[in-house]
């Protein structure tokens, strides 16, 4: 019983922190805006990975490096809905109709501000870099604009 109560409190805290106690209904986002976001976010993550690999990547195999590129794409997919909440606030604050450049700027800011180096260090130090599987290769081969995301906008 104590475990059940603890799980319920954990779930409530998670919901409170992730969605501020209200459901954000997904709406359509213009494809050009979505592409601008994805390209810039992944480019920022990949730039950070290249810098990290220059310093720490000597002991990693080629397959492990590919897996880390997949981690970048999966991280973007996983946190897409939260990015959209932040992006919607920024776009609403503009006070005008957004253009592709606004989404490009915000995507670049996300890619630059999220420091994935700590995550790479953790995966490497704990020997938790995922095994490279065919579905990872499929996502890595996709252009950043084609990486699927589930939350489509405001």
UniProtKB/Swiss-Prot annotation:
Chief site of localization: cytoplasm
GO cellular component: acrosomal lumen
Subcellular location: Cytoplasmic vesicle, Secretory vesicle, Acrosome lumen
Gene Ontology annotations of biological process type: single fertilization
InterPro entries found in the cross-reference section: Egg_lysin (IPR001379), Egg_lysin_sf (IPR035916)
Keyword Signal: yes
Gene3D superfamilies from the UniProt entry: Fertilization protein
Signal peptide residues on this chain, from the entry's feature table: 1-18
CDD domains (UniProt xref): Lysin-Sp18
Keyword Signal: yes
Disulfide bonds: none
Tissues and organs where the protein is expressed, per its UniProt entry: Sperm (at protein level).
Resulting phenotype, residue 150 to A: No effect on VERL binding. Impairs VERL binding
Key words of the record: Cytoplasmic vesicle, Fertilization, Signal
Subunit structure and binding partners: Monomer. Homodimer. Molecules associate into dimers and then rapidly dissociate again. Interacts (as a monomer) with the egg vitelline layer protein VERL (via VERL repeats); each VERL chain can bind multiple copies of lysin.
Role summary: Creates a 3 um hole in the egg vitelline layer through which the sperm passes. Does not have enzyme activity. Species-specific interaction between the sperm protein lysin and the egg protein VERL exposes a basic surface on lysin that may dissociate the egg vitelline layer via electrostatic repulsion. Plays a role in ensuring species-specific fertilization.
Descriptive protein name: Egg-lysin
Organism field: Haliotis rufescens (California red abalone)
């Amino acid at each position: 019983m104590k475990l059940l109560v603890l799980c319920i409190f954990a779930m409530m805290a998670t919901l409170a922190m992730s969605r501020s106690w209200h459901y954000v209904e997904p709406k359509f986002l213009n494809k050009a805006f979505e592409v601008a976001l994805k390209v810039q976010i992944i480019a920022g993550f990949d730039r950070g990975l290249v810098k990290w690999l220059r310093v720490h990547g000597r002991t990693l195999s080629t397959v492990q490096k590919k897996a880390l590129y997949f981690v970048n794409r999966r991280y973007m997919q996983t946190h897409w809905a939260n990015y959209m909440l932040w992006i919607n606030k920024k776009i609403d604050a503009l006070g005008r109709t957004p253009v592709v450049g606004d989404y490009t700027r915000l995507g670049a800011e996300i890619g630059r501000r999220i420091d994935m180096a700590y995550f790479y260090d953790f995966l490497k130090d704990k020997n938790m870099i995922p095994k490279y599987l065919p579905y990872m290769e499929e996502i890595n081969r996709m252009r950043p604009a084609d990486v699927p995301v589930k939350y489509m906008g405001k």
